[in-house]
A protein has these predicted regions:
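Charged helix-capping and loop-helix junction motifs
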Residues: 26-32
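Alpha-helical structural signal in soluble globular domains
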Residues: 33, 37-41, 60, 186, ...
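Beta-rich interaction/scaffold domains
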Residues: 148-219
Length: 219
């Protein structure tokens, strides 16, 4: 579904890690090819493994890391993709950091401790929190926020709330109140989607346009 709120790619061979596999020929080939494809598909997050070292990139705009704001714990409405490389959950092996100055790496860690990453997704946020598995202390956390566009709906809510009931017929006023109530409830609904917002905005606009003034003959 191309219209889903969040898009995640998961595959094994990390293209943005900081251990020895980062310089493998097949990894370099993937790094030269895949980011463009991911950009075209509007991917938000890429989760990877293989090179057993924790690495979180900056937001990557194509092949270019956005380092303008330094290392952040969250971004809002970003351009680009976040790439995260897992370390090892089993502790079977750990790879040392060989590229500590990699320009794409915002956070890297090799403490030779097992790690796990929890992903929590809502309509407006995508949070990745990585823990040390031995005591569940936090190694790193990062959240991407996407704000919903509610400006048009909020403008119509204000317009509707400023109208005088006495000026309009009961039937048209009741239709307006139903649309207004739905829009206001949606404004504070954490699970609302942009499609929900757009539909409520349209319904409220139609209700306002459909108001009939008292004493006006519509026949």
């Amino acid at each position: 579904n191309p219209d889903v709120r969040w898009k995640t790619v998961v595959f094994h061979h990390s293209i943005y890690s900081t251990a020895s596999h980062a310089s493998d020929g097949d990894i370099i080939d993937r790094r030269n090819e895949l980011p463009q494809i991911f950009d075209e598909l509007d991917i938000d997050v890429v989760l990877m493994g293989h090179d057993h070292v924790y690495t979180r990139t900056y937001m990557m705009d194509g092949f270019t890391p956005d380092r303008s704001q330094g290392v952040q714990s969250s971004v809002t409405n970003p351009t680009g993709i976040l790439y995260l490389t897992a370390n090892s959950a089993s502790g079977s092996k750990y790879y040392g950091i060989t590229a500590p100055e990699a320009e794409y790496a915002a956070v890297q860690n090799q403490s030779k401790r097992r790690t796990v990453t929890n992903v929590e997704v809502t309509n407006t946020s995508y949070t990745m929190t990585t823990y040390f598995a031995d005591d569940m202390s936090v190694l790193d956390t990062f959240t991407i926020y996407k704000t919903l566009n509610t400006a048009d709906m909020e403008s119509l809510i204000s317009q509707a709330q400023g109208l005088n009931q006495a000026d309009y017929t009961e039937e048209s006023w009741n239709k307006l109140q139903a649309a207004l109530k739905a829009a206001v409830e949606l404004k504070y609904n954490a699970n609302a989607t942009q499609s929900d917002i757009d539909a409520a905005t349209t319904a409220l606009q139609e209700a306002i346009d459909g108001l009939v003034k008292v004493g006006v003959n519509t026949n």
